[in-house]
Amino acid sequence: MNSFLFSLACSLLVAIPAISAQDEDAGGAGDETSEGEDTTGSDETPSTGGGGDGGNEETITAGNEDCWSKRPGWKLPDNLLTKTEFTSVDECRKMCEESAVEPSCYILQINTETNECYRNNEGDVTWSSLQYDQPNVVQWHLHACSK
């Protein structure tokens, strides 16, 4: 019985990404949006691959020539983030894209009341700490993508 459950779980790990890829190829909206709102209210955990390590990530073609996706209401605890000096989303995104500092910058979290910008301080984010539906916070995720 255990080997059957293991086989079933492995099959799902292969089938689910393939189905998601078919949805994207067919013009499906997906869960993440660029510059727009999250259209599904999704609570799925994002991939832990860093945006700065393109060799370990699938290439994503962004629909609006942008390599960022927006997650309103997503919040990581302060101990997983480092505050930056930037106060605008554009400046913060540019800093992240051009950063050569380790770990690679691929998660930005913006406090929309204070306009404070935070970035991931670890290479692998602890997604189990992620909180959803939090007020006054927006996360931006940088993807390895082609324009």
Swiss-Prot record:
<feature type="disulfide bond">
    <location>
        <begin position="92"/>
        <end position="117"/>
    </location>
</feature>
<comment type="function">
    <text>Inhibits collagen-stimulated platelet aggregation (IC(50)=60 nM), dense granule release and serotonin release. Does not inhibit platelet aggregation induced by ADP, arachidonic acid, and thrombin.</text>
</comment>
<keyword id="KW-1015">Disulfide bond</keyword>
<feature type="disulfide bond">
    <location>
        <begin position="96"/>
        <end position="105"/>
    </location>
</feature>
<keyword id="KW-1199">Hemostasis impairing toxin</keyword>
<keyword id="KW-0964">Secreted</keyword>
<keyword id="KW-0732">Signal</keyword>
<keyword id="KW-0800">Toxin</keyword>
<feature type="compositionally biased region" description="Acidic residues">
    <location>
        <begin position="22"/>
        <end position="41"/>
    </location>
</feature>
<dbReference type="GO" id="GO:0090729">
    <property type="term" value="F:toxin activity"/>
</dbReference>
<feature type="signal peptide">
    <location>
        <begin position="1"/>
        <end position="21"/>
    </location>
</feature>
<dbReference type="GO" id="GO:0005576">
    <property type="term" value="C:extracellular region"/>
</dbReference>
<keyword id="KW-1201">Platelet aggregation inhibiting toxin</keyword>
<feature type="region of interest" description="Disordered">
    <location>
        <begin position="21"/>
        <end position="71"/>
    </location>
</feature>
<protein>
    <recommendedName>
        <fullName>Leech anti-platelet protein</fullName>
    </recommendedName>
</protein>
<feature type="disulfide bond">
    <location>
        <begin position="67"/>
        <end position="145"/>
    </location>
</feature>
